[in-house]
Amino acid sequence: NNFLQKKILNSYDNFRPDLVVMGHADKVTSLTLEKMKNFDKNLKISQWFLDPLSRHGPDHLNNTNRILDKIEFIDNTFLTTDPKALNIKMPNSLFIPNPCDPSFEILENFKKECSFDVFFAMSHGVHRGSLKRGKKDDREIFINNFIKKNKKIKFDVYGMNKVQPIWGDQFMKKISNSYMGLNLSRGKPIKYYSSDRIAQLIGNGLLTLIDHKTYLKDFFTDKELVFYNNLDDLSYKINKFNKDRYLGKKIAEAGQKKYLKYFNSTVVSDFMISRIFDIKSKNKFIWNKD
């Protein structure tokens, strides 16, 4: 680990940046950040964190320790959960949406006839290539009940029931075959949190269904996303839009248009920089009320 810290400090010394941004950089030590700050008192250090932080979610203690580990040297923290909904207090913490990128989100599923009705994918850890034996996830119970209730719906499901998770190009190939996508994250819903799957579902033009308890209605209307209250409501809406494909595709197209316009990586990065350096931006940040 000393070798890594030296490499980081050498890179810092070579470039002397005004800003260092870390994302899930667990191996960087507080001492390394302290040394950087000692080199340059005006240096800004920020972190972003995309994992769940709710006390009702998975890995709560571990994720909390990770985000607070170097907090004394962090000027700003950007989270994909509303900081006000958390029981962790972090100075200068702000919400950011999961960014999309038009060079990655390239599909327009609303323009075609898909062979599957509903897509859902999960895993037992970020980019973990295979299922963990004996590992259970609450989502499996929900999805299996959902499938049982809707025998006429064609599901394409990965990461459970002995079907391995999918990543990268394989993920894109599979997602291209579905009309609707279920966005269901681990743990109980919490304000604004979603895994980054939301960007892939909406951004690729799937009609996306999400729990209303995420409060994403603050940014999207019923003409852009489909919000459900419980399993029965989700079943009703899946069947409704499975029959009314014209309306479903219009909603999917409007959702993609908004996500690519307001939640793209350029706009999200600009928001971060504008808040870090207190600079006014010409962009509209629909998720920020300040």
Segment roles from a protein language model:
Residues V163, I190, K223, D244, ...:
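Generic anion/oxyanion-binding catalytic loop in active/binding sites
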Residues S46-H60:
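A short, histidine- and acid-enriched strand-loop-helix "catalytic/donor-clamping" loop
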Residues L33-K41, I147:
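Surface-exposed amphipathic alpha-helices with a cationic face
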Residues L225-L231, K240-R245:
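Conserved acidic donor-binding segment of nucleotide-sugar-dependent glycosyltransferases
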Residues L234:
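Catalytic phosphate/metal-binding cores of nucleic-acid and nucleotide-processing enzymes, i.e., regions
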Residues K237-D290:
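C-terminal amphipathic helix plus adjacent low-complexity
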Residues F3-K7, S11-F15, G23-L31, H56-P58, ...:
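Nucleotide-sugar donor-binding catalytic core of glycosyltransferases
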